[in-house]
């Protein structure tokens, strides 16, 4: 499985993945960690909701007919908040056959997969012994 980086990928890449059976995580063009985390995150500022929604919508419309895509990703390292909750809700309303992941959602509702980056072996072991896990873990 390959994860597209949070920038639009060349259309030929999608064709190659479809043709040769490579599974793909397609990722919305959202990365704003340079603007801050926590309260300063653009994910929590509804002024940026339209931009988040537009980029998620464009990803979906561009890629929805590619069979190689098995997971949608809402973006990369952009904090978590109302903007990602709304984009998750929208994406699940139009597409309910493929899971949606968002790394910064951690264990919040707006991700179907626990997909934390840069985890240690101890972090993985700690997740696996939790009693209430119901999401797959992908690095």
Report residues per predicted region.
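Substrate-binding/catalytic cleft of secreted carbohydrate-active enzymes
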Residues: 1-139
């Amino acid at each position: 499985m390959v994860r597209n980086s949070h920038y639009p990928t060349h259309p030929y890449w999608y064709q190659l993945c479809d043709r040769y059976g490579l599974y793909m995580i397609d990722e919305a063009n959202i990365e704003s960690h340079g603007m801050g985390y926590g309260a300063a995150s653009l994910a929590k500022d509804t002024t940026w909701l339209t931009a988040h929604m537009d980029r998620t919508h464009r990803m979906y419309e561009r890629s929805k007919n590619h069979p190689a895509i098995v997971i949608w990703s809402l973006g990369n390292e952009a904090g978590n908040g109302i903007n990602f909750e709304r984009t998750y809700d929208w994406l699940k309303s139009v597409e309910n056959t493929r899971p949606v992941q968002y790394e910064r959602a951690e264990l919040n509702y707006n991700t179907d997969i626990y997909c934390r980056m840069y985890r240690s072996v101890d972090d993985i072991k700690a997740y696996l012994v939790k009693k209430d896990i119901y999401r797959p873990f992908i690095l």
